[in-house]
């Protein structure tokens, strides 16, 4: 006899024992409601990671309107991958990259979030050279 409930299948053997086979595609629920202190989103560490990526990738970059969409996508993916390497397993990372041309004009940016102030956080970094400016915001939201 076998019964299946949303990714779990229970099988009864002839001895009356049952085993649980979990669907390998779904993450295991650990019932952790808060991250331990060492695994909390640390804005200073994340900001250093962002700054390192921007410095390496944009130090000699020139603004070109045709190339900027691909560059913003590549930067956001690189930063997101670096943040995953830091061990934020239970966090959903959102990385926003804005690149603009240096023309002597001003730019105002804002973000609002509805989240748990105890577990979720964000940081941002700004990079500028003679040709362009880049603003990166990284948001970490804890999975319950």
From Swiss-Prot:
InterPro entries: Tctex-1-like (IPR005334), Tctex-1-like_sf (IPR038586). Signal peptide: none annotated. Belongs to the dynein light chain Tctex-type family. It comes from the Eukaryota. It holds the Pfam family Tctex-1. It is found in: Dynein axonemal particle. GO terms for molecular function: dynein intermediate chain binding. PANTHER family: DYNEIN LIGHT CHAIN TCTEX-TYPE PROTEIN 2B (PTHR21255:SF7), T-COMPLEX-ASSOCIATED-TESTIS-EXPRESSED 1/ DYNEIN LIGHT CHAIN (PTHR21255). One of its GO terms (cellular component) is dynein axonemal particle. The lineage of its organism: Eukaryota, Metazoa, Chordata, Craniata, Vertebrata. Gene3D superfamilies: Tctex-1. The keyword Nucleotidyltransferase does not apply. This is Dynein light chain Tctex-type protein 2B. Light chain of the cytoplasmic dynein complex 2, a multisubunit complex composed at least of eleven different proteins. The cytoplasmic dynein 2 complex consists of two catalytic heavy chains (HCs) and a number of non-catalytic subunits presented by intermediate chains (ICs), light intermediate chains (LICs) and light chains (LCs). The gene is Dynlt2b. One of its GO terms (biological process) is intraciliary retrograde transport. Transmembrane segments: none annotated. It comes from Mus musculus (Mouse). Disulfide bonds: none annotated. Acts as one of several non-catalytic accessory components of the cytoplasmic dynein 2 complex (dynein-2 complex), a motor protein complex that drives the movement of cargos along microtubules within cilia and flagella in concert with the intraflagellar transport (IFT) system. Required for proper retrograde ciliary transport.
């Amino acid at each position: 006899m076998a019964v299946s409930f949303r990714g779990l299948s229970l099988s009864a053997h002839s001895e009356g024992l049952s085993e649980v086979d979990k669907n390998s595609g779904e993450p295991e629920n650990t019932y952790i409601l808060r991250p331990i202190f060492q695994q909390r989103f640390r804005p200073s560490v994340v900001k250093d990671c962002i700054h390192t990526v921007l410095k390496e990738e944009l130090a000699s970059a020139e603004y070109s309107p045709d190339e900027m969409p691909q560059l913003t996508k590549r930067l956001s993916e690189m930063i997101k991958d670096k943040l995953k390497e830091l061990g934020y397993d239970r966090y959903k990372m959102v990385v926003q990259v804005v690149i603009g041309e240096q023309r002597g004009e001003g730019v105002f940016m804002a973000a609002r979030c509805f989240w748990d102030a105890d577990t979720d956080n964000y940081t941002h970094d700004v990079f500028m050279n003679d040709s362009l400016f880049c603003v990166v915001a990284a948001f970490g939201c804890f999975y319950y």
